[in-house]
Amino acid sequence: MSTRSSFADEEQNKVPRIMTFRPSYEEFQNFSAYIEYIESRGAHLAGLAKIQPPAEWVPRKSGYDIDNINMTIPAPICQVVTGAHGVYQQINIQQRRQMTLRQFMEKANSELHQTPRHFDYDDLERKYWKNITYISPLYAADVKGSLSDEDLDVWNIGRLDTILNLVNTDYNIIIDGVNTAYLYFGMWKSSFAWHTEDMDLYSINYLHFGAPKTWYAIPPAYGRRLEKLANETFSENYQECNAYLRHKMTMISPKVLRQHNIPYNKITQEAGEIMITFPFGYHAGFNHGFNGAESTNFASKRWIEYGKRASICRCRSDMVKISMETFVRRFQPERYDNWLKGQDMGCHPEEPGKICAAAPPTLNEYEKQENLRAAKSEEESPQKRGCSLAGNGCERNAESAEDVDDKASVSSYSSCRQLQPVVKLRKLPTIASVPEPSSAPKRYDFNTEAVVRVKRLWNELPCPDRGANLLTNGVVKNTKRMRFQTKVLTLDDED
């Protein structure tokens, strides 16, 4: 027992610690360059870093008098927590009635929700975990907007100007809270559950005013350990969705993390301080009282490998999914073709030695060009016996074909948006019913040949244009129902 404890202590001593940086105003001028600098110092190894901005940086010159902040919270959420012994599930119930920021502050400072008396931050942390399931707090999360001045040019969270802007530039897509700013107004015990950022992106969080915020962070190198613990503890949730931690519902206490030898760090963010989370850095935390923060995501070239291999929740339609096509094409041109083919072999940055192919997009230019050439070749060759297609050609690789009978269906992640084609397919006899001349040198399995033909016809089904669906491939995992989009080939038996 002592040997195991000694080993755990030794490993904990090797865990990267959260670093705090105090840049000068000159060093603070270039956001992306400074992120590269703190990573050169190893800040990313802990998954979280704190930055204390220079005194010259004033994001809001008018201050934070609540009466001067014209802000309405459209749908605050009530956080209901269930569970015991350090393992909890947090359910966010959206309230129907909107609130002004002043009303929210008065609620936060009321006797029911005010911060309890405490000696220090450690004492307050103990009270948090002891009372986590009692008196559900309100949290004003994901509120569109910014508290920063529009003319703020340095570290303006609403426009950080990183490569994540390419999502808007190339796809003309704006994702609220990802490439725009979100505001968060908290009260005592309002929490953010264990999660990594959407697509394992970076994030920046600036605490504009109010009570502190406690953060927990797991170094990215140990992120899989947390996933394993969560998947075993909440196995039903995992069976429903193998990326269910992205639902941001799971709270696990530091005590339980220690029991399972999962290294973590803890830090308190004060008003006026910035927190940076790094790719695949799991983090969680809670607010000490009424406060206001501003946050968004950003990216760097180092993130691209994380993004290509990020887990994606497919059971919720509102989950953020970003095409990696523009990033691979621009910054990894030597790997682009292989990536499109699903042959971009490599490791997840936090799992060295575990080689696998990065998931390709479901639709891409390579597939289109290949199928265009195949379609052209078929047009030049005589039509094969028994098959004709009523409809347009298509640029799509085959997925799979099922039973060749009076009708067939094939699973696909992308449904066609055109008229359903009708395929006239002569029903082929089985090999047992086909007379075989004694001199025949070959045996033909006509059922197999029919499947091949249906696959070819499937390739020719009309599909959306490039850019309409560039999401990552992956298996939809659900024990209660399998969610697939299907296209139907209607087979007409002329025999």
Curated annotation (Swiss-Prot):
Cofactor: binding details: Binds 1 Fe(2+) ion per subunit.
Reactions it catalyzes: N(6),N(6),N(6)-trimethyl-L-lysyl(9)-[histone H3] + 2 2-oxoglutarate + 2 O2 = N(6)-methyl-L-lysyl(9)-[histone H3] + 2 formaldehyde + 2 succinate + 2 CO2; N(6),N(6),N(6)-trimethyl-L-lysyl(36)-[histone H3] + 2 2-oxoglutarate + 2 O2 = N(6)-methyl-L-lysyl(36)-[histone H3] + 2 formaldehyde + 2 succinate + 2 CO2
The species this protein was found in: Drosophila melanogaster (Fruit fly)
Subcellular location: Nucleus
Binding site for 2-oxoglutarate: Y139, N205, K213, K248
Residues at which Fe cation binds: H195, E197, H283
PROSITE patterns linked: JMJC, JMJN
Assigned keywords, A-Z: Chromatin regulator, Dioxygenase, Iron, Metal-binding, Nucleus, Oxidoreductase, Phosphoprotein, Transcription, Transcription regulation, Zinc
Key word Oxidoreductase present: yes
Protein's UniProt name: Probable lysine-specific demethylase 4A
InterPro entries for this protein: JmjC_dom (IPR003347), JmjN (IPR003349)
Keyword Cell division annotated: no
Main localization, broad class: nucleus
Domain JmjC: 149-315
Enzyme Commission number(s) of this protein: 1.14.11.66, 1.14.11.69
Record function comment: Probable histone demethylase that specifically demethylates 'Lys-9' and 'Lys-36' residues of histone H3, thereby playing a central role in histone code. Demethylation of Lys residue generates formaldehyde and succinate.
Cofactor(s) in the UniProt record: Fe(2+)
GO molecular function, one term: metal ion binding
Domain of life: Eukaryota
